[in-house]
Structure formats: structure tokens, C-alpha cells
Amino acid sequence: TFADDDIYPVVNVAESWGGLRATTQWGEFVLDAAGDAPLGIYVMMPSSIPATPFETNGADFTAEDMKQWKDHPLVLGLGEVMCYPAVLSKEEQIMKKLELCKGMVIDGHAPGLSGEDLKAYVEAGVMTDHECTSFEEAKEKCLAGMKILVREGSAARNVENIVPGLVKEPEFIAHFMFCTDDKHIEDIEQEGHIDHNVRKAIKLGMDPIDAICMATINSAKCYGLRRLGAVATGYQADLLVLDDIENMTIHDVYYNGQRIDQDSEITVRECPVELKNTVHVGNFAVDDLTLESPDGSFYVIEMQEGEITTVRKRVQLFDGPGVFRADEDYQKIAVIERHKATGKTGVGIVSGFGIRGGAIASSVSHDSHNIIVIGDNDQDMALAVQELIRTQGGYTLIADHKVFDTLELPVMGLMSDAGFRYSHIKLKRMIEKAHEMGVPDGIAPFITLSFMALPVIPEIRITPRGIYDVCTGEFYKY
């Protein structure tokens, strides 16, 4: 019954064309639209705008910019601290943000961080992490003093790898919570949201009460929401009435003592025009997607089913100089800068995505939210990019050299203002078609795609500047 919203995607985009005025306008729009909603909405100030110094995003959001937000009653703290190398090296701006938010909740983002580096990260003030992919990693971070959010979204699914460890060592459960970290409305419709995580944990052997605590009181305590998360005197009457606790079959929902009518019509607010028309691409042409190597070797982003981590590979495709052409094993990926029309385009190769006979593209690509596209031919990839320029953002799928469908996301290229049903139908249709075109069932076509541009998750990513090695902190050059 409450959501803790890290607004970094909005700030990444809004700042580029409207400064703090645009960010403020967005905040006012959301809070006003949610005022009558049966949901408590809280905000984390974005810590990582940009996520790293070598990102090509729309803005900087400094500690000085944060001061006007810090004491707002709905602001709980600092959003996930993405660039842990900056914390370890005590980079000036991130240390100012950590100091500003001392005493508040500070979320983390530390995939694979361990040992002395983990201790230094925690000692800097970071309190949570949601990037654990194994119980061993989660346990080490918990013992270092962190609270752990076990993630189960559309792309990254970690409950099955972590919960069995908690069942064996239940003394750690009080320090664990659940999150989704990007989940398609299509998957929410089919599976549920946090209730799906609870349901899955119970099936993996966790006591139902422990699983429910991870979804309720543990989260409320972590984020300092003292009147939420329990059924007791002095707590807000946010309740679920279940038909079956084992299967988490929800009969009724109460928010602040009021029963929620699940059949009531949802009113979609008209978004201010100032929050639209934010996709600004330089002179883009199909030739910008050409990828050649002087020695015939290429770096490859190997995608993994059920994860958003990648594996770094280098493959020899030619005996000498050559231009890459996609095949059954390797497809092309590109990221096109869309905030300031710089004309920058990074091009690379992926394996494991599998799409054949077309291309898929999105203006949602963490964290800078440039346009990202994967395809098996340059013409369809270019068509996908042009389609998103035309719609000023969205998800699109190209099949057989034609636009199969597009879900427009006109609000900063990140969100739809057309309502749930419209978005759900469009997205479902494209996801099903993408799987028909070869995308494996273990990969969420649009969400997994969106994480390929996030240069703080190992091992290898792509930005408008090119292929980036997260482990070495270097861009590859051909």
C-alpha cells in the first residue's frame, strides 16, 4: 500500500530541457494525480544523475540541487548510489550527497561488491542493496550491515537463488525485503507484483508469515515508515484479506481503513504538454549503424536469461578487416543519444537475444534513457529509431521491414498517458511477437534491452560513446 519512488529517470530527462523547473513540475503532477489514489507515494532523491561520469544523459543533479527537496515530508532519503567506484574513491560530488542525506535512508546499488570495498561502501553510509544474485552475496552484504531487497522483476529474477538460503538460515530474514526493480505491466497482470514474490517464496519453503513480513513490516521499518506494515494499534489500516495464505489469493484490499473497489474506473490525468516532446536526436542515418573491425575481432555483450548481468566476450569473425553482419548467433545493438541532439551513436554486438527478421527499440534505457535498439539488419534498426523519433518515445517492434506495433511513451519518452488497458494490450502484443521472432522466454524483450545501456552492472555495456567494460572502466576501440 505504499511505493518508494526513485525519480532518477525523470530527472535524467527533464533536467535536459527544463532544469529544476521541469523536475518540480513533474513532482507536482505526480503527487497531484496520486492524491486520491489508494496508495502512499514517497520519493527518494536521485543520487546518480548521471549514473557515471562517462554517461551521455540529459543533466547533472548536484547536492546543491537536492537541498530544496531534502526536507519535504514525502522524501525519505537518497536513491540508489549507482557508481560505487566514485564512493570508494571519495569523489567530491557523491560524498557531498551522502553527507547531505546523513540520517536518512540511503539506497545502494552494488552488484558483486565484496570484501574491503563492500565495507568501505557501507561505511560511507549506504544502507540497502537490491543487486544480489545469490544467497552468499546477500549474506555477506547483510553481515556488513546492509538491508537486502530480494529482486523479482521481468528481467532479473533472484528469489529462487536467495530464498532457499533464508529458509536454511532464518535468522537473517528480519534484514530482508522484496522488490521488483522494473516489471512490465504485462507480467504484473499475469503474476502480480510483490504478492508474486511472497507467493514464490512460500513455494520455495519459506514460512508464510516470514514471507509476508519481508513484504510489509521489514520494508516499513527500513524506510522509517513507523505507522505502516503491521496490523496493530497505532498503525494505518492497510490490509489484505486473503482467501488462502499459502497461495496468497487476495480477496479484498483496504487502504487507510477504506475498502478498495477493484472494479472502479481509473481516471487518466492529462499530462502537461511541457513534459512531452523530449526526444532530440541529431542527424541519424542507417550508415551510423555500421560496425567494422581492422583485425576481424569484435567485442560481444553476452546476455543471460533471468539476469541483467552480462558476460564479456571477444570473437574472431574474420581473418582480416571486416564489416559485421548479424547472423543466428550474433545481433547488432546500438544506443543513440536523444537528449541534446549530439549525433552520438554507439554500436556493438550482442549474443543471447536471438531476434530474427527485424528489430526492437526503446527510449527507456537505464539510466540515461537514450534510444536503444537491437536487430538483425541495419534497415530495420534504423526504421525502429525513426519510429521512436516520430512518436517522441516508446517501445517499438519491427518485423519484415515494417512497424509491427508501437507503444507510445510521450511523457518524457518514459511513460504512457493512455491508461493501463491500452498500454497492456499493446505491450502484450509486442512481447508475444518478439518471442515468436526468437527472443528466449527467459529474456524480457524490452526490460532486458533497457538494462544493456547501464554501465554500472558487470561485465560489459553499451552507451552512445561505444562499448564499455564495467570491470576495467574503459571503452573498447576498434
Identify the meaning behind each predicted range.
Residues 2-104, 403-407:
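Divalent-metal coordination cores built from histidine and acidic residues
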Residues 18-20, 49-54, 85-87, 113-118, ...:
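Flexible loop/turn segments at secondary-structure boundaries
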Residues 2-3, 34, 98-101, 121, ...:
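A generic structural signal for well-ordered alpha-helical segments
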Residues 14-18, 46-47, 83, 111-112, ...:
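Short, ordered loop/turn segments at secondary-structure junctions
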Residues 12-17, 76, 80-82, 123-124, ...:
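Short, basic, glycine/proline-bearing loop/turn elements
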Residues 4, 189-205, 209-478:
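Active-site microenvironment of metallo-dependent hydrolases
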Residues 29, 60-150, 157-178, 187-210, ...:
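Histidine/acidic residue-rich metal-binding segments in metalloenzymes
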